[in-house]
Amino acid sequence: METATLVAIFISCLLVSFTGYALYTAFGQPSRELRDPFEEHED
């Protein structure tokens, strides 16, 4: 394979894994530990 193809595949995999981790952090198990500043603030 050419170098450009390998670099493109590597960057694509990196982007997909970062997106998957961000979705897991936002909606998965760790999301229970996130705080909501709007819920903490009382008017």
UniProtKB/Swiss-Prot annotation:
May play a role in photosystem I and II biogenesis. GO terms for biological process: photosynthesis. The keyword Ribonucleoprotein does not apply. Keywords: Chloroplast, Membrane, Plastid, Thylakoid, Transmembrane, Transmembrane helix. It is found in: Plastid, Chloroplast thylakoid membrane. This is Protein PsbN. Pfam families: PsbN. It comes from Huperzia lucidula. The chain crosses the membrane at residues 7-27. GO terms for cellular component: chloroplast thylakoid membrane.
